[in-house]
Amino acid sequence: MKSILRSTTRNLITSSRRFENLKTTEEIRNFLAESTWSINELLKSPTGSSQPEVSPEIVKKMLKLSGLNDLKDDQSVTKALNLQMMFINHLYDNDHETVTPSPKRNENNGIFRLLASDHLPQRPLELNNLLKQINELKPDPSKGEVDFTISDLQRDSFVINKRKE
């Protein structure tokens, strides 16, 4: 467990700066007020990256799907999305089991992971299919479902006597 924690801690260190000992409250306050790192330190350059870039077409498609109008400043949105994708890829760099999309798949699938239920219409529910599923049901003893018929219930007779009071 310690080795996992140690390796995780090593991955979180972004620079090898040494800081002087902070002794007073004012020194600590001043130190915390200054930004000592930038998210840009963690981002790889988009030119050396093998990831697909977010194209203006994808931005327009996302805006259309979200119900927003086309923006006049598509460039800034595209740049922001590219930076976010680079940062997310940085977070998952240590995960060697990530699946890379095959070239035959849609370009958007490599960028946005959609659940099948989000974009594929389901078959409509029909009465015939429901009746077929009901007929195919079998009782499962592991769930406490016991197989019995109506004749099993009718075998035991119950008599209720009403008393007149």
From Swiss-Prot:
Subunit of the heterotrimeric GatFAB amidotransferase (AdT) complex, composed of A, B and F subunits. It catalyses: L-glutamyl-tRNA(Gln) + L-glutamine + ATP + H2O = L-glutaminyl-tRNA(Gln) + L-glutamate + ADP + phosphate + H(+). It is found in: Mitochondrion inner membrane. It is a peripheral membrane protein. One of its GO terms (cellular component) is glutamyl-tRNA(Gln) amidotransferase complex. This is Glutamyl-tRNA(Gln) amidotransferase subunit F, mitochondrial. The keyword Nucleotide-binding applies. Its main location: mitochondrion. Residues 1-19 form a transit peptide. It comes from the Eukaryota. It holds the Pfam family GatF. Allows the formation of correctly charged Gln-tRNA(Gln) through the transamidation of misacylated Glu-tRNA(Gln) in the mitochondria. The reaction takes place in the presence of glutamine and ATP through an activated gamma-phospho-Glu-tRNA(Gln). Required for proper protein synthesis within the mitochondrion. GO terms for molecular function: ATP binding; glutaminyl-tRNA synthase (glutamine-hydrolyzing) activity. Its EC number is 6.3.5.-. Keywords: ATP-binding, Ligase, Membrane, Mitochondrion, Mitochondrion inner membrane, Nucleotide-binding, Protein biosynthesis, Transit peptide. InterPro entries: GatF.
